């Protein structure tokens, strides 16, 4: 589900290009454990993966859950959350699955413990005009793998025969 994607901060095979759920969320709505509506909106979205150097701004609005329609519900509170981009990834490792708090960002990577996500808006990306994915795996000495990766990167990094390098 869309809510499960956010709750797990999922990425899939295109995460190398565009990141995981947190990178591509425009906004989402959820019902909290106390029965209120919570709307979370990413402000000033760059339409790209979150950079470790960036500060990411979120607007969090809590609305009265006694009103069934969240659009008509009374606003109980609004706050802005600023999180450093570095909390979303570990240097050299990609997504940091050990950091469940994520600076206080509700629901993302919490596996459903903050509430039930009911809807979301996403940043969509146009697929590149490529039809094949190649995944490389190396065994043996890391120095040999490093040399091979550098050679491949130099070849593909220049758009060799329509190839696109990601990773």
Task: Give, region by region, the residue ranges found by the protein language model.
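FAD-binding subdomain of flavoenzyme oxidoreductases
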Residues: 1-152
């Amino acid at each position: 589900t869309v809510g499960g994607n956010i709750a797990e901060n999922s990425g899939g095979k295109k995460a190398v290009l565009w990141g995981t759920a947190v990178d591509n969320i425009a906004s989402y709505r959820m019902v909290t454990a106390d029965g209120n509506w919570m709307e979370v909106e990413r402000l000033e979205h760059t339409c790209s993966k979150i950079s470790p150097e960036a500060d990411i701004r979120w607007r969090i609005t809590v609305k009265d859950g006694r009103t069934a329609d969240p659009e008509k519900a009374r606003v109980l509170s609004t706050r802005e959350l600023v999180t450093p981009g570095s909390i979303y990834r570990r240097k050299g490792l990609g997504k940091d699955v050990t950091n469940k708090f994520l600076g206080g960002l509700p629901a993302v990577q919490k596996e459903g413990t903050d509430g039930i996500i009911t809807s979301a808006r996403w940043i969509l990306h146009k697929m590149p005009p490529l039809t094949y994915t190649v995944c490389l795996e190396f065994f043996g000495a890391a120095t040999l793998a490093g040399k091979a990766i550098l050679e491949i990167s130099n070849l593909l990094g220049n758009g060799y025969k329509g190839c696109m390098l990601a990773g």
